[in-house]
Each structure stands twice: as structure tokens, then as C-alpha cells.
A protein has these predicted regions:
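Phosphate-group recognition and catalysis centered on beta-loop-alpha active-site segments
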Residues: 1-199
Length: 199
């Protein structure tokens, strides 16, 4: 089975994580895909950042969901990079690789589904260009209920068998196991059930 090179939060060994520059570097390095994390801003924009606050990554402070997009854009990562929106990442990638969107909390699912649907219907993308993943299985269930064409990845760091059962229920495309669950036996178990392994 083919090994995919997925740039976790972009090529963060070269550029600050979850920035347009990190994602561009991943494209330059011919990554098969990128992984990123999303939260919602106070005014409903999908923001690409790992933490629920901007404290660690920027020169600002505060929770992402309490700040508007203009406020978030006013703070910089590594003194020069803006926090990107998911739209900006989609436009940058432009169908060149897979985009794995990790929902960091429940309230992001409907906006992400709407955005993916828009790019498929209006910009000639395919659903296969995306995979939506989360530790919040309730959010993944809602993604499945809204649009069964969107590929789903089930994240787990504890019970692999439970994750496999849930993945079968929602017809997921992949299992995203935490690294300590990754051994030959578990990898084989996941693949035998027809799922991709995307740790």
C-alpha cells in the first residue's frame, strides 16, 4: 500500500505551523497532502490555527472565538505572518494536494461543510480533495448527516476498536490513530477493514 506524505500543519520544520507559508512550502516539497486545524472567529470565519487561543502562536492574546477576523488579522505569527482563513488555504492549494481539515471543536462542522460544498460546486474541486477529521465524533456524525460525499477521518487516541466501529457506521475513509496505537497489528487491522491510516 502506498505511503502518503502528509505535511502536519504544513511544512512546519521550515515555516511557522498553520501559515500560508508553511502550506506553500509543503506544496514546494511535493507533499501528497496537508493537515490543518480550524476554529471559528467571533464573526463566523473559519480560522486555521491549532490552539483555541492565539497566545502561543502570535503577538496577541485571546480566544479565537472571541475575536473578529480583522482583529485576528492584526496579530502576527513570528512577527510577519497573518493567521490564515480556510478559504485562503483552499485558494493557495488550488487542488494540488489533499487537504485534511481537523475540526478542533463542534461549532466548526457546518461552516466547513458549506465551504467544501461551495468549492466543489463553484470552483471545480472534487470531494476527494478533502478529508474532514476530528476527535469530536459527534461533529463527524453531523458532517456525515449533512453530506455523505465528504470523506471523513476518525481520530482516536484510546479505543481503536470503538473508532473502527464508528468509522464503519459513518462510512469514513480513514482512521487517524494517535502514534502510540500505531503498530503492525493495528495498522493491518485498520487496512483490512478498508480504511486509510493517517496518523
Amino acid at each position: 500500500m502506498q505511503m502518503l506524505n502528509i505535511a502536519h500543519r504544513g511544512a512546519k520544520g521550515y515555516e511557522p505551523e498553520n501559515t500560508l507559508q508553511a502550506f506553500q512550502k509543503a506544496l514546494d516539497l511535493n507533499a501528497d497532502g496537508i493537515e490543518l486545524d480550524v476554529h471559528l472567529s467571533a464573526d463566523g470565519h473559519i480560522i486555521v490555527i491549532h490552539d483555541e487561543t492565539i497566545d502561543k502562536m502570535t503577538n496577541g492574546k485571546g480566544f479565537v472565538n472571541t475575536l473578529s477576523l480583522p482583529e485576528l488579522k492584526s496579530f502576527l505569527i513570528a512577527e510577519k505572518h497573518e493567521i490564515p482563513t480556510l478559504n485562503e488555504v483552499f485558494d493557495l492549494v488550488d487542488k494540488k494536494c489533499l487537504i485534511n481539515i481537523e475540526l478542533k471543536n463542534f461549532d466548526t462542522f457546518s461552516k466547513v461543510v458549506d465551504l467544501i460544498d461551495g468549492y466543489v460546486s463553484e470552483k471545480n474541486w472534487k470531494y476527494e480533495h478533502f478529508i474532514v477529521s476530528s476527535f469530536d465524533w459527534n461533529a463527524l456524525q453531523h458532517v456525515h448527516d449533512l453530506n455523505q460525499n465528504i470523506p471523513i477521518g476518525v481520530l482516536t487516541e484510546t479505543d481503536l476498536n470503538l473508532a473502527l466501529a464508528f468509522a464503519e457506521t459513518i462510512k469514513a475513509k480513514a482512521i487517524h490513530p494517535y502514534y502510540h496505537l500505531l503498530n503492525e497489528e493495528n495498522t493491518q487491522k485498520i487496512q483490512e477493514k478498508g480504511f486509510l491510516v493517517l496518523p
